[in-house]
């Protein structure tokens, strides 16, 4: 669909550093939740300090862990694909300030 194509293009632009930048460091300093949607095993192998781990395939059934739909959520994974899916899931469930930060490792280097 057009929406998925648009999200994929934006992910590629983000990875290449094209287009407007989001200051994830500032969002996190202001209290944004870092949501890592990789598997439990991937998360155990390394993650951003204080990140919440909810694998993307469990996100729809775990939304109660993210109670405040107005709280800023910065999603990350290994490459940006699963976090893009997580962003769409959260937005379709009424979350208002959701960002796809792409790779957790890249995000960590910006913090």
Region spans (language model):
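N-terminal glycine-rich beta->alpha transition that marks the start or flank
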Residues: 36
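Short, surface-exposed ligand- or partner-binding patches at beta-edge/loop junctions that are enriched
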Residues: 76
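Rhodanese-like catalytic fold shared by cysteine-dependent sulfurtransferases
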Residues: 5-32, 40-71, 81-111
